[in-house]
């Protein structure tokens, strides 16, 4: 696989070609994903739940993300590697820059932050200092205590309109990717069409430019439960490499997610 850059993803959007992405946390699985030409990997703070056994992502630290970012980069030298900024690691623009630098030095090509228009100055400061940003909207797991649980976001018109405005504001501030989690497919379509940058979805229908899954869900090995929007590709193939290849194929052909794996 040749080195993947943000320009490749922009070209995918411009040409109407969908792309698949996944979380990854170690060198072995990163190598597996690279062998199947997975263009984008995310070292997610979801590691707090799937690796550390926590109830949520809040205990994850910058040091945790940096450690796993180094591991994933070792296994996949050519992917576009995103790294999550953990809870309270970007409370101010200055703090965000300091912590993002740690993750970029660990091998990330981009950092992902959760939140809306209140992050405009943070995104501006990061991008002005050569740190690419993915803006995460919708169900933002670090806000689980504000939401009162893991709930679909953007169902009512006011909330939906605000999310569209936030996506555009963050794009205009310099964000190069928007990630939507657990939002109605109709809202994901609005945002994808409104944004010039690539939009990645999880639990947001198949109208986005790209899709992402937590790898443990893709392989059906999550300890607690399988989200409605996820699919066990390993059960269909019996082989991890074939599972990744099938996931990638179904995303690229817009077969996944289908109606059974879409939030109305």
From Swiss-Prot:
Quickly give the catalysed reaction: 3-methyl-2-oxobutanoate + (6R)-5,10-methylene-5,6,7,8-tetrahydrofolate + H2O = 2-dehydropantoate + (6S)-5,6,7,8-tetrahydrofolate
Xref: InterPro entries: Pantoate_hydroxy_MeTrfase, Pyrv/PenolPyrv_kinase-like_dom, Pyrv_kinase-like_dom_sf
Its keywords, alphabetically, are: Cytoplasm, Magnesium, Metal-binding, Pantothenate biosynthesis, Transferase
**Which GO CC terms are listed, alphabetically?**
cytoplasm
Residues at the catalytic site: 181 (proton acceptor)
Under Pfam families, the record lists:
Pantoate_transf (PF02548)
**Gene Ontology molecular function, alphabetical:** 3-methyl-2-oxobutanoate hydroxymethyltransferase activity; magnesium ion binding
Identify the pathway.
Cofactor biosynthesis; (R)-pantothenate biosynthesis; (R)-pantoate from 3-methyl-2-oxobutanoate: step 1/2
**Residues engaged in binding Mg(2+):** 45, 84, 114
GO biological process per UniProt: pantothenate biosynthetic process
Q: What is its EC number?
A: 2.1.2.11
Annotated localization: Cytoplasm
Q: What is its main location?
A: cytoplasm
The note describing how and how many cofactors are bound reads: Binds 1 Mg(2+) ion per subunit.
Into which EC class is this enzyme placed? transferase
Q: According to its UniProt record, which cofactors does this protein need?
A: Mg(2+)
For the ligand (3-methyl-2-oxobutanoate), the binding residues are 45-46, 84, 112
**Which proteins does it associate with, and in what oligomeric form?**
Homodecamer; pentamer of dimers.
Q: Please give the family membership noted in the entry.
A: Belongs to the PanB family.
Known role: Catalyzes the reversible reaction in which hydroxymethyl group from 5,10-methylenetetrahydrofolate is transferred onto alpha-ketoisovalerate to form ketopantoate.
Q: In its UniProt entry, what is this protein called?
A: 3-methyl-2-oxobutanoate hydroxymethyltransferase
What species does this protein belong to? Vibrio atlanticus (strain LGP32)
């Amino acid at each position: 696989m040749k080195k993947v850059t943000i320009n490749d993803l922009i070209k995918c959007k411009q040409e109407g070609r969908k792309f698949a992405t996944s979380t990854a946390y170690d060198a072995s699985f990163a190598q597996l994903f690279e062998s199947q030409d997975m263009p984008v990997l995310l070292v997610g703070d979801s590691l707090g739940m799937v690796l550390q056994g926590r109830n949520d992502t809040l205990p994850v630290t910058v040091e945790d993300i940096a450690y796993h970012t180094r591991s994933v980069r070792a296994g996949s030298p050519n992917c576009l590697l995103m790294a999550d900024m953990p809870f309270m690691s970007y409370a101010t623009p200055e703090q965000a820059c300091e912590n993002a630098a740690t993750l970029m030095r660990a091998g990330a090509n981009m950092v992902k932050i959760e939140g809306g228009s209140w992050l405009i100055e943070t995104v501006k400061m990061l991008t002005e200092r050569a740190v690419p940003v993915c803006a995460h909207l919708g169900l933002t797991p670090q806000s689980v205590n504000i939401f009162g649980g893991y709930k679909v976001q953007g169902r009512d018109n006011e909330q939906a309109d605000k999310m569209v405005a936030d996506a555009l504001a963050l794009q205009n501030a310099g964000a190069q990717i928007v990630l939507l989690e657990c939002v109605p497919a109709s809202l994901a379509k609005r945002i994808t069409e409104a944004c010039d940058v690539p939009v990645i979805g999880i639990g947001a229908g198949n109208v986005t430019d790209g899709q992402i899954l937590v790898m443990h869900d893709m392989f059906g090995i999550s300890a607690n439960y399988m989200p409605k929007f996820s699919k066990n590709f390993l059960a269909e193939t019996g082989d991890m490499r074939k599972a990744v290849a099938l996931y990638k194929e179904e995303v690229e052909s817009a077969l996944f997610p289908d109606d059974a794996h879409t939030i109305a």
